[in-house]
Amino acid sequence: MECPVCGSNEIVWDNKNGEVVCSNCGIIIDNIYYSGQNESESTDTIIISNTFYKDEILIKELRIKNFLKKNRIKNKKTDQYEIILRSMLVDAQYKKIYKVLYDEGILSGLKAKSKLGLLIYFRFALNDRYLHQLKEFNIKNENLRKILKRIGRKRLTLIFDKLNEESDRI
């Protein structure tokens, strides 16, 4: 087949648009006509069971939903402890303790629950009233002990000395 206008043999069958086009001059030479019977209907259809893949997708979706639910609950608890922490910082003594701990760099990287536990510990550490306070806020003493161990004994004494200096100034 050749182009009637330019005589070129470079003809392109554009099945997407249903046209026969000359690649040299770009003229549409003819339209492509399809038969009434589709090729997909003439062949035997093969049915593949996708239940395995569907089950796997459902399992992944459920896993993601459960993770998001648990994550929301954790965020709500964290928000509660942040609210408690902010309300405690209204008190002048807690504010001073927080400032000293912040200046020492101890509060960086800790969650609000741990910060709250440290504030309670440094406020009531001398008379062991902090254990009762920790129970009220559902803070485990073991977690507080781990944080205090990470801080170290020398640093703890330094912090207590700074807190005593702050209280002597007033």
Curated annotation (Swiss-Prot):
Keyword Metal-binding: yes
Amino acids binding Zn(2+): 3, 6, 22, 25
Cofactor requirements of the protein: Zn(2+)
Gene3D superfamilies (alphabetical): 2.20.25.10
Zinc finger (TFIIB-type): 1-30
Record keywords: Metal-binding, Zinc, Zinc-finger
UniProt KW Zinc-finger keyword: yes
A Pfam family assignment: Zn_Ribbon_TF
InterPro entries in the cross-refs: Znf_TFIIB
GO MF terms held by the record: zinc ion binding
Stated family: Belongs to the TFIIB family.
Protein name: TFIIB-type zinc finger protein
Species for this entry: Saccharolobus shibatae (strain ATCC 51178 / DSM 5389 / JCM 8931 / NBRC 15437 / B12)
